Each structure stands twice: as C-alpha cells, then as structure tokens.
C-alpha cells in the first residue's frame, strides 16, 4: 500500500494548497464524500467501462456528493483530473492524506482508542484529556470495543501505540517467562 500512498501524496498536497485558499473544513468534507463514493465497487466498475465517457464519470462522482463545493470549478477540475489519469481508486488514500495535512496544520492527530469495554462520556473525556497531555497535541478520537483485550485500552496515534490492555500485559509476562 506504500505505492498508493506515494501516488496519492501529490494529489492530496495539491488539493490541500487549494483548500488553504478557502474553507479547509468544507474541502475535507468534499474529499471524504468523494472517497466514500470511490469505495463503491459499482462506481469503479462504471468508471472503468469503455461505454462511459470520462466526463460522465466525473459528473457521476460530483453528483453523488452533498457538499456545496462539488459544484465549484476547482472541485470539477480536481475530479476530472483524477478521472483522466485513472486515479479514482486513489480517492480514499487522498482523503486520508488530506486529513493528515489538515490535522498537522491544526496541531491535532487522530487517535484510535480500542477498549475492552464501552466507554461512557466522562470516562472517554478523562482518557482523551490524559492522552492529549501525553502526546502533547489535540486528539480526535475514534472509539472501538474489542473484548479480546480482557481489560484496559490500546491507543494508536499516528505510528505510536500505547497498549495498556490486560492481553498485552499477559503477552509480555509470557515472553519474560519463556525467555
């Protein structure tokens, strides 16, 4: 997947430069919506059909998004360029990299929190507050539940992983005892 990331990076950076001249949040919404549409196998099938023109594919993509930016000339040019270069399948990766650029500009990061049990509002706020102090930046959490952790949480922020789960502690103890 590193190849996809390498190919998608210039598109994401160019789109981000365009977005800096306007509303970054609105562009983020547009690119996320386009990525969702591009994930649909039906759309990729239509896009690769020789019976459908490139202009029709671009119009289909833009018609499928709700964002008001979809009607703008810059958005149309971006989508048309992706269609012309056969890069529609890159939209999810472009969206991911666009979000990373947006987070970097805001001094924030996405945090994936996996807990053994569901976290209520107060527990989640307390956990996120502590994690923000540890990672020294604002975090945008996404929470999932995985009962196989037995207890505790596993937090992933960028390429850093903080695993305080019981399963990780048991694995660590097992490694220490068998070494």
UniProtKB/Swiss-Prot annotation:
Superkingdom of the organism of origin: Bacteria
InterPro entries in the cross-refs: ATP_synth_OSCP/delta_N_sf, ATPase_OSCP/dsu
GO CC, any one term: proton-transporting ATP synthase complex
Subcellular compartments: Cell inner membrane
UniProt cross-references to SUPFAM superfamilies, sorted A to Z: N-terminal domain of the delta subunit of the F1F0-ATP synthase (SSF47928)
Principal subcellular localisation of the protein: membrane
GO function term, MF aspect, one: proton-transporting ATP synthase activity, rotational mechanism
Record's keyword terms, sorted: ATP synthesis, Cell inner membrane, Cell membrane, CF(1), Hydrogen ion transport, Ion transport, Membrane, Transport
Pfam families attached to this UniProt entry: OSCP
Keyword Ion transport included in the entry's annotation: yes
Membrane-topology descriptor: Peripheral membrane protein
Entry's family note: Belongs to the ATPase delta chain family.
NCBIfam families listed in its UniProt record: ATP_synt_delta, PRK05758.2-2
Subunit structure: F-type ATPases have 2 components, F(1) - the catalytic core - and F(0) - the membrane proton channel. F(1) has five subunits: alpha(3), beta(3), gamma(1), delta(1), epsilon(1). F(0) has three main subunits: a(1), b(2) and c(10-14). The alpha and beta chains form an alternating ring which encloses part of the gamma chain. F(1) is attached to F(0) by a central stalk formed by the gamma and epsilon chains, while a peripheral stalk is formed by the delta and b chains.
Record's function text: F(1)F(0) ATP synthase produces ATP from ADP in the presence of a proton or sodium gradient. F-type ATPases consist of two structural domains, F(1) containing the extramembraneous catalytic core and F(0) containing the membrane proton channel, linked together by a central stalk and a peripheral stalk. During catalysis, ATP synthesis in the catalytic domain of F(1) is coupled via a rotary mechanism of the central stalk subunits to proton translocation. This protein is part of the stalk that links CF(0) to CF(1). It either transmits conformational changes from CF(0) to CF(1) or is implicated in proton conduction.
Protein name: ATP synthase subunit delta
The species this protein was found in: Burkholderia lata (strain ATCC 17760 / DSM 23089 / LMG 22485 / NCIMB 9086 / R18194 / 383)
Lineage: Bacteria, Pseudomonadati, Pseudomonadota, Betaproteobacteria, Burkholderiales
């Amino acid at each position: 997947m590193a190849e996809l990331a390498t190919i998608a990076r210039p598109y994401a950076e160019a789109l981000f430069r365009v977005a800096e001249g306007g509303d970054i949040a609105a562009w983020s919404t547009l690119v996320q919506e386009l990525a969702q549409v591009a994930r649909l196998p039906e759309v990729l099938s239509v896009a690769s059909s020789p019976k459908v023109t490139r202009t029709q594919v671009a119009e289909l993509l833009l018609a499928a998004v709700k964002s008001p930016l979809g009607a703008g000339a810059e958005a149309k040019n971006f989508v048309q360029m992706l269609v012309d270069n056969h890069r529609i399948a890159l939209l999810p990766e472009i969206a991911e990299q666009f979000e990373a650029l947006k987070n970097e500009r805001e001094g924030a990061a996405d945090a994936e929190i996996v807990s053994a049990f569901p976290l209520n509002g107060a527990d989640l706020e307390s956990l996120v507050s502590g994690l923000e102090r540890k990672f020294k930046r604002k975090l945008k959490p996404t929470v999932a539940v995985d009962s196989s952790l037995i207890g505790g949480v596993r937090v992933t922020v960028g390429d850093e992983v903080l695993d305080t789960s019981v399963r990780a502690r048991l694995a660590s103890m097992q490694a220490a005892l068998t070494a």
